[in-house]
């Protein structure tokens, strides 16, 4: 919209105009060379100008051809003929992986089905397997086993004695339930150590 200018002997004026709501704007005096805001060209950087000056159609295509749409698309060749050797190889690998994944899933499903079916062992078999384990462990070196057990029991006895000393010295004022249970096992530990030492 062009701004309506009025000129007289006193200078140049922007004429009074009516607003959309019906009120009137005053006429304003304008200096020489003044350009109203609406008429100032919008700044465009060089990239915007470049893209505006660029044709919208690809090179070699006229506007008449584009508007009628008479240009024919070249027929696409088969995907297999355009793929390179490595692309074909990769396609084969992907297909192979898909097949293997499907097979793996089937095997996994079958395995889960087998796990759901509980095959119960008979008590005789359980006893035989546990006896076999115990027999093989004890047949290796019974003296070494007993020595190891004595060592562990002495360690426990030492811990009980240290706990008793802490209680007697007042370091532990109120022993916990577990500590009291540990103290009560002292006699049983001593008896077990004596029995094992006699067997050696």
Swiss-Prot record:
Enumerate the SUPFAM superfamilies for this protein.
Pym (Within the bgcn gene intron protein, WIBG), N-terminal domain
One Pfam assignment: Mago-bind
Give the chief site where it resides: cytoplasm
Where is this chain compositionally biased, Basic and acidic residues type? Answer: 97-118
Gene Ontology terms, MF aspect: ribosome binding
Protein localization: Cytoplasm; Nucleus, Nucleolus; Nucleus, Nucleoplasm
Any one GO biological process: nuclear-transcribed mRNA catabolic process, nonsense-mediated decay
**Where is there biased composition of kind Polar residues?**
64-85, 119-141
Record's SMART domains?
A: Mago-bind
Q: Where along the sequence do coiled-coil regions lie?
A: 84-200
Q: Which UniProt keywords apply?
A: Coiled coil, Cytoplasm, Nonsense-mediated mRNA decay, Nucleus, Translation regulation
Query: What ranges does the record give for the region Disordered, renumbered to this chain?
Result: 1-30, 52-147
Q: Which GO terms describe its cellular component?
A: cytoplasm; exon-exon junction complex; nucleolus; nucleoplasm
Q: Please report any disulfide bonds recorded for this protein chain, giving both cysteine positions.
A: none
> Highest taxon of the source?
Eukaryota
The Basic residues compositionally biased stretches are 86-96
What InterPro entries does its record include?
PYM1, WIBG_mago-bd, WIBG_N_sf
Subunit annotation: Interacts (via N-terminus) with magoh and rbm8a; the interaction is direct. Associates (eIF2A-like region) with the 40S ribosomal subunit and the 48S preinitiation complex.
| Record family assignment | Belongs to the pym family.
Q: What does this protein do?
A: Key regulator of the exon junction complex (EJC), a multiprotein complex that associates immediately upstream of the exon-exon junction on mRNAs and serves as a positional landmark for the intron exon structure of genes and directs post-transcriptional processes in the cytoplasm such as mRNA export, nonsense-mediated mRNA decay (NMD) or translation. Acts as an EJC disassembly factor, allowing translation-dependent EJC removal and recycling by disrupting mature EJC from spliced mRNAs.
Q: What is this protein called?
A: Partner of Y14 and mago
Q: What gene is it encoded by?
A: pym1
